[in-house]
Amino acid sequence: MKRFLTTLLLTACMLSSLTGCGSKADEKEGNGTLPIADNSVDFAYSLKLGWNLGNTLESTGTRLLNAETAWGQPKTTKEMIDYVKEAGFTGIRIPVTWSSHMNDDYTIDEMWMDRVQEVVDYGLDAGLYVILNSHHDCEKYFPTEENLENGKAYLAAVWTQISERFKDYDERLIFESMNEPRLINTAKEWWFTENDPDGLESIRCIVEMNQTFVDTVRSGEHYNKTRYLMVPSNAASAQNALSDAFSMPEDEADRVILSVHAYSPYDFAMNANGYTEWTEERAPELSFLDDLYEKFVKNGYGVVIGEMGAINKDNYEDRIAWAKDYTEKASANKMSCFLWDNNGTKIGSENFAMIDRRNQKIYYPEMLQAMLANYQ
């Protein structure tokens, strides 16, 4: 019997080598650091506190490898991403702009795809969950009826190629359909009234494009059948996700997650001319997290706050208090949070920083610890 079992094992090993089981993804499996939950809510929550590699692979204005440093960030290294893990983060979101690196038939340049894969590998090798998206490609998936078929064609082309490249990467790699799809360069880019016809049309188009994304990935091979997939509403806002016009895509694997961006409350977190103090009286302004729980989490859909943060207004103690309250409520509602980081440390709008990438240190350690404490 032992000889028979040995023969079977040897035969299985030989067959495995012939079928490509020694892939990059298989080398990553079984490292014992990252569990894969079997439902959307638990998986989304297992991402805990994550970090965005901001202003890097999503940079625009130049092509191919020069793009990575075009917005002032250093070239991403393995040591840098290892430090993200060391600092206590559980996941990394890698924003990527694809439309600057393809030809007219949407074929992505091989050199660009290789570099993106290299950075994804840094994250997985470090023991992090990785979110990969389509970032500053909003013109391609402009959410109107007039552009809907073009948007669906673009998403199908891009995610077919990405899915094929990463088909052997397990579920620790998450795909996110679009970044903040919206009516760019219009008066309704970031906000519209609840019943605005253009706004509602845009949400309906995004629902359809999210479905195209899910169908495209699921038509791929191997782990694409079971990979967790993130989808947003208009501008990835909580308000638009809560709209009756928005619904989650159908998915035979039942593994879709809502993606929300919430620099909230806006007047504290993002408006340079807003208020600077954070007190207990402000806590109700985070009630949108409860609303998201009611519509999505209670109905089996995980929620990831894919971008959040508060700009520096020379109010560090208040930002620590905000960070504690924000992540405490998010965690209580079984949502993970990914801190936006564009390495901007100056006082003023759009400056978000936590990790000094060049020197591998934390700019605001007390603020980070306040957030990590809610995901222990």
Which residues does each PLM region occupy?
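Acidic/histidine-rich helix-loop elements
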Residues: 53-76, 104-108, 147, 267-285
